[in-house]
Every structure is written in C-alpha cells, then in structure tokens.
Amino acid sequence: MINEIYENSNSRMKKSIDFFKKNISKIRTNRVSPSLIENIYINCYGTSVPLSKLSNILSEKSNILKINVFDNNIIKKIEQAILSSDLGVNPQIQENYIRIEFPKLTEARRFELIKLINKEAEQNIISIRNIRRDANEKIKKLIKAKTIGKDEDKKFQEVIQNLTNSRIEDTKKILKLKEKEIKKI
C-alpha cells in the first residue's frame, strides 16, 4: 500500500515536470524552435488540426522558421491561423512553403520572459508540494485505519520529502537552463 502511494506520487511529480518542460519549451529564446508554432490549430478538412500534422516545420536560421506545407490548398488557412495567433509575426507565403521571421529579443522582452518562466516554475513547485500533501494525507488515513504504524509513517514522510526535494531541484535546474538560454545573446 505504501509502495503504491509512493509510485503514484513519483509518477504524478514526473508528469508535472514533463508538463513544465513542455510549457517552457514554447517560450521563445534567441533561437526559435518549431515547438513555438507546432500546436497552432488550423480549421481544415472539417476539423481543427495542429500545424505539426499538416506540415514539416524547420528552423532555417536562428530567427526564421520554414513551414513546408503538405497540401498547398490549405496554405492560406495556415497563414491566417498564424496571423491570428499571439506570436505577433507576419508569415510570408513562398511557392509551397511559409517563412516566418521572428524579431530579435530586446532586453525588456528577455526580462518579461524570465519573469514568465519563473512563474511557471513556481506553479510547478506548488503542484509538486500538493502531490506530497496528498501522499501524506493518504498515509494518515492508513494510520487512522490502523493499517500501518507510526514508525512506518515517519519513514514514509521522510522518503516522500526526499522525493519532493529532488523534483523541486529538477524544476530549478530546468529553470536555470532556460534562463541562461534566454539571457544568451
């Protein structure tokens, strides 16, 4: 029973960190990444489809993305979806592909991005702590039901605290790497 609680907590904390990584990977640094636009949805073929399923997205230069569209009939729809996104860029249609040139980051924008990723990191840390709290509450219920003793409770709390500290440290490492990436000129 205790092992199940531990494994569940560990799994949830890993998912939380993966979600955090995914969220901050979408935040632009000096080098643009296809992940910035791959989840823009385009209304075509009677449904809403992510751009990554309709095209091949390449990083042409540090600030230019090239979108090789599979079906030229939807190239205008893709352009409209990019224009209506909050990226603030102008896509340029050229033959069978779209080029997007992103402006260089200003110092003020870098500062805003660092604040944003710090906020994301703090939310992730709160999520990890909530998972720890849930695990501790489950253990307290087991104590009340007299399924486990107080000694096991203390050991488990120590183990879950070490896991929590480790996952928070992982979050902080990911944060520092992303900050370094944003600050890099």
From Swiss-Prot:
SUPFAM superfamilies per UniProt: Ribosome recycling factor, RRF
One GO BP annotation of this record: cytoplasmic translational termination
GO cellular component, one term: cytosol
Cellular compartment(s): Cytoplasm
GO molecular function: ribosomal large subunit binding
Pfam families with a match to the protein in the record: RRF
Keyword hit for Protein biosynthesis: yes
Coiled-coil ranges from the UniProt annotation: none
Domain of life: Bacteria
Keywords: Cytoplasm, Protein biosynthesis
Family affiliation: Belongs to the RRF family.
Role this protein plays: Responsible for the release of ribosomes from messenger RNA at the termination of protein biosynthesis. May increase the efficiency of translation by recycling ribosomes from one round of translation to another.
NCBIfam families membership: frr
Name of the protein this chain belongs to: Ribosome-recycling factor
Taxonomic classification: Bacteria, Pseudomonadati, Pseudomonadota, Gammaproteobacteria, Enterobacterales
